[in-house]
């Protein structure tokens, strides 16, 4: 749709008059024309390139551009801005949530490391206490065993001394009897018991 300029309006009635002249055939004749005189197609330019319609074309271009600009400003741009704002807010919320989760994870890691260090220290302390207790118990057991062995050794030594004393006593008696028998065999008479005992005692001292 175009606005009609005055120049185009002046040309239009002339063209219409020529067309009407050809549009009324005589009675009984067959009309075979298309309503355009021969050679009229080459006279008029293509409407978009017609300089007489530039003003209306520019007017409609300005109107179309204005409508498009208003549509962009009032409808499309606000929607795009709202979408961008919504995405920006969502991204900001996601970043804040990620930061919060990271802080919680760092705190959990620090807590875990602290508890692990405390558990290690406690285990070392328990191990040291157990080793110390084991050393004390082993020392007490060693002393108890040594005391028991010492008592047993003393008892054994006393018994051995008693056995030795008894053995020496028996040996003295046997020696006296043997010496008396030997003297009797040698001299043919029995020696005095006191002399035999004195001789055996002197022999023990020499041994």
From Swiss-Prot:
Which HAMAP family does the entry link to? ATP_synth_b_bprime
Xref: PANTHER family: ATP SYNTHASE SUBUNIT B (PTHR33445:SF1), ATP SYNTHASE SUBUNIT B', CHLOROPLASTIC (PTHR33445)
The protein's location, in the record's own words, is:
Cell inner membrane
Q: What does this protein do?
A: F(1)F(0) ATP synthase produces ATP from ADP in the presence of a proton or sodium gradient. F-type ATPases consist of two structural domains, F(1) containing the extramembraneous catalytic core and F(0) containing the membrane proton channel, linked together by a central stalk and a peripheral stalk. During catalysis, ATP synthesis in the catalytic domain of F(1) is coupled via a rotary mechanism of the central stalk subunits to proton translocation. Component of the F(0) channel, it forms part of the peripheral stalk, linking F(1) to F(0). The b'-subunit is a diverged and duplicated form of b found in plants and photosynthetic bacteria.
Keyword Cell membrane attributed = yes
Q: Which InterPro entries does this chain map to? A: ATP_synth_b/b'su_bac/chlpt, ATP_synthase_B_chain
Classification via Pfam families: ATP-synt_B (PF00430)
Instruction: State the oligomer form and interacting partners.
Output: F-type ATPases have 2 components, F(1) - the catalytic core - and F(0) - the membrane proton channel. F(1) has five subunits: alpha(3), beta(3), gamma(1), delta(1), epsilon(1). F(0) has three main subunits: a(1), b(2) and c(10-14). The alpha and beta chains form an alternating ring which encloses part of the gamma chain. F(1) is attached to F(0) by a central stalk formed by the gamma and epsilon chains, while a peripheral stalk is formed by the delta and b chains.
Query: Which GO cellular component term is one of those annotated?
Result: proton-transporting ATP synthase complex
Q: What is this protein called?
A: ATP synthase subunit b 2
Give the residue spans that cross the bilayer. 53-72
One GO MF term: proton-transporting ATP synthase activity, rotational mechanism
Q: Which domain of life is it from?
A: Bacteria
**Record membrane topology:** Single-pass membrane protein
UniProt keyword terms in alphabetical order: ATP synthesis, Cell inner membrane, Cell membrane, CF(0), Hydrogen ion transport, Ion transport, Membrane, Transmembrane, Transmembrane helix, Transport
Q: Which gene encodes it?
A: atpF2
Whether Membrane counts among this entry's keywords is yes
For this chain, the family text in UniProt reads: Belongs to the ATPase B chain family.
